[in-house]
């Protein structure tokens, strides 16, 4: 069985992964058929690059992505795009849907960032209040 999975590279505590197509019986960092992308989890935000046409080709041939790679592919919007192609949508419809999807993703990221900032601010205020009450 052919899998689309991660191959670790980089140095100690600084991982960089290649997204590869490999036989499921080969070791994690062993023999592979093709490199179809890269993933850098240490960057903020994470960097994911995919050769979308090659991932689509291999998935069409029956390659199964692992759970982690599946979530990475989903994060790039490729699964959504492939689903629309499978449903028979036109290229123009797919392009407009992908623009909407990207806008929604950006809105989600912005919302997540603002929520984190609010939580940090509230936590600092609570710590300051507890410190001032402990002093007095």
From Swiss-Prot:
> Would I find NAD among this entry's keywords?
no
The coding gene here is: rpsP
Ribosomal protein among keywords: yes
Its GO CC terms are:
cytoplasm; small ribosomal subunit
Q: Which Pfam families match?
A: Ribosomal_S16
The record's similarity note reads: Belongs to the bacterial ribosomal protein bS16 family.
- Could you mention a single GO BP entry for this protein? translation
Alphabetized, the UniProt keywords read:
Ribonucleoprotein, Ribosomal protein
Using the UniProt annotation, give all residue ranges assigned to the region (Disordered).
114-136
What PROSITE patterns does the annotation carry? RIBOSOMAL_S16
Bias kind Basic residues: ranges? 114-123
Tell me the GO molecular function terms: structural constituent of ribosome
Give the protein's recorded name.
Answer: Small ribosomal subunit protein bS16
């Amino acid at each position: 069985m052919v899998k689309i999975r991660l191959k670790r590279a980089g140095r100690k505590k600084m991982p960089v992964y290649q997204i590869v197509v490999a036989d499921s019986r080969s070791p994690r960092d062993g023999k592979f058929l093709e490199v179809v992308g890269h993933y850098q989890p240490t960057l903020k935000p994470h960097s994911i690059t995919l050769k979308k046409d090659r991932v689509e080709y291999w998935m069409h041939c029956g390659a199964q992505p692992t759970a982690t790679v599946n979530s990475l592919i989903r994060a790039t919007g490729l699964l959504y795009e492939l689903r629309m192609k499978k449903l028979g949508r036109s290229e123009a419809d797919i392009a407009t849907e992908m623009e909407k999807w990207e806008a929604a993703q950006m809105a989600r990221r912005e919302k997540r960032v603002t929520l984190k900032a609010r939580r940090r601010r509230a936590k600092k205020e609570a710590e300051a209040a507890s410190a001032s009450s402990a002093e007095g």
